[in-house]
Structure formats: C-alpha cells, structure tokens
C-alpha cells in the first residue's frame, strides 16, 4: 500500500463518535431536564438511542461527503459480491458461530464481575422513555448498521495504513475505539459502568476489525447482522416505555 502524507481526518474520526455522544447527551439533558448537574446528566442517560441517531446522521453525512471527495461512492460498500456469494455466506456462518462466545460472553461475564448480576447492568442501559422517543429509537439500529462498522473499518483503518501505520496497529486501534465508544452510550460517571462498557465489546470489536481487514466485501452481511443485533435492543425500549 502506497504511503500518503499525514492526514488528520482519520485520526479525528476515531474520536468523533465518542465526542458527539457526550455532547448530545449533555444537550438532551439541558433540553429535557431541570435541576442540578447530576440529575440532568443521569436523566439524559436514558435517552442514549436518540444520541446515537443524531451522531449517526452526522457521521453518515461526513462519510458520504468524504468518499465523494475521493472520487468514490459510499453506498458501494454495501454491494453484494455475487462472484463470491457462496463463499461469503459460509464465512458469515462461521462468524455467527463465533458470535455467541466472543460477542455475548464478555458482556455477561463482565457485568457479573462488576455488578454481581448482569440484570443490574441491563437496567442502567434500558430505561423507560416516552412512547414517541421509544418508537423513534427504532431508527438507531438501521443507522448503526449503515455507519458504525463502515466508519471504523472501511474508512478510518485503510487510511491509517496509507499513512504508514502498521496493519496490526491500525486493526488494534479501530477495534479498540469501536468498543471504547460504548463508554459514552450512555456516559454514566460510575467506574464500574465505565469499565463494563469499555470491555464488554472489546473481543468482538477486535474480531470484526480482523475479519473486515481480511475480507472487506463482507460489509453488507455485517450490516445486516449489526442491524438485527441492535434491533433487539431497540425493542427492549418499547417494552418498558411510558405509555
């Protein structure tokens, strides 16, 4: 891969989502809640699906624009490669087999280690919202499928490598920040919760980073799986919403 001159943009994109989550949580707190800072921030934490939607819309616009600047089309990354369709389906089947132990066990085990009961961590994440907000939250899984993995793995990672970053380090960085952004969705200033959100997706994020570097044409399949995973979370908000 030809090494290009230093470009700050991919480095900023590593941090952008975390920053936007934090800012939008604060703005929602100011708009919806009154009282002291602690109650404002705590109340806004329940609205994290909306912060994700707002963040994803900004990131989607940036990605479309950045790809266009480079003479490419962002939406092309979601095209299925029909020439390798059967091979890619078998690869995704193998990935789904790993999804259980790598994707879900760290979540459950870290919650049990830090909180004693995984349900305690879940209760901090899934809180009642007004019905309209819970319904609007159904948009976040689809936006996540369009933005999250493409941003880190197909935009940032290749451009870090073009600047001379070693492939293993580019994979490690994008995998780490893909996981670490969850500290801010929502951000709750509790060391246990911060640790939980930092580590719960780390093995899964690194697996995604490795697979996406090896076979980036799997992006449309990853997008579908990602939407379905997040859709199950969005449905939980419907089950606890204020009617």
Predicted regions, residues:
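N-terminal, membrane-interfacial amphipathic/helix-forming hydrophobic leader that caps
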Residues: 1-80, 87, 113, 231-243
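Residue-level recognition of hydrophobic positions within alpha-helical transmembrane segments
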Residues: 6, 13, 21, 52, ...
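Residue-level signature of transmembrane alpha-helical entry/exit and packing/kink sites
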Residues: 10-18, 44-52, 87-92, 129, ...
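Hydrophobic membrane-targeting alpha-helices
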Residues: 23, 27-31, 35, 65-66, ...
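Transmembrane helix-loop-helix hairpins at the membrane interface
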Residues: 26-29, 130-243
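Juxtamembrane helix-loop-helix connectors linking adjacent transmembrane helices
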Residues: 36-49, 72-147, 243
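Hydrophobic alpha-helical transmembrane segments of polytopic
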Residues: 52-55, 96, 174
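Hydrophobic alpha-helical transmembrane segments of multipass integral membrane proteins
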Residues: 57, 101-102, 176, 231
């Amino acid at each position: 891969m030809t090494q290009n001159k230093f470009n700050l943009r991919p480095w900023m994109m590593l941090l952008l989502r975390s920053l936007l989550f934090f800012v939008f949580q604060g703005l929602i707190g100011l708009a919806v809640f009154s009282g002291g800072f602690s109650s404002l921030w705590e109340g806004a934490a329940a609205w994290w699906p909306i912060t994700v939607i707002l963040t994803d819309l900004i990131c989607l616009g940036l990605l479309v624009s950045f790809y266009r600047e480079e003479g490419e089309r962002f939406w092309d990354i979601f095209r299925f490669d029909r020439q390798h369709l059967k091979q890619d389906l078998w690869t995704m089947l193998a990935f789904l087999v790993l999804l259980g132990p790598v994707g879900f066990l760290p979540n459950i085990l870290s919650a049990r280690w830090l909180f004693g009961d995984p349900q305690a961590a879940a209760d901090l994440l899934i809180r009642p919202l007004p019905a309209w907000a819970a319904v609007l939250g159904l948009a976040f899984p689809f936006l996540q499928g369009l933005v999250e993995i493409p941003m880190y793995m197909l935009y940032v990672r290749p451009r870090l490598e073009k600047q001379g970053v070693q492939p293993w380090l580019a994979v490690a960085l994008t995998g780490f920040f893909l996981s670490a952004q969850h500290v801010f969705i929502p951000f709750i200033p509790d060391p246990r919760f911060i640790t939980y959100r930092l580590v719960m997706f780390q093995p899964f994020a690194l697996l995604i980073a490795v697979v996406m570097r090896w076979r980036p044409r799997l992006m449309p399949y990853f997008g579908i799986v990602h939407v379905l995973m997040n859709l199950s979370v969005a449905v939980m908000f419907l089950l606890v919403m204020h009617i």
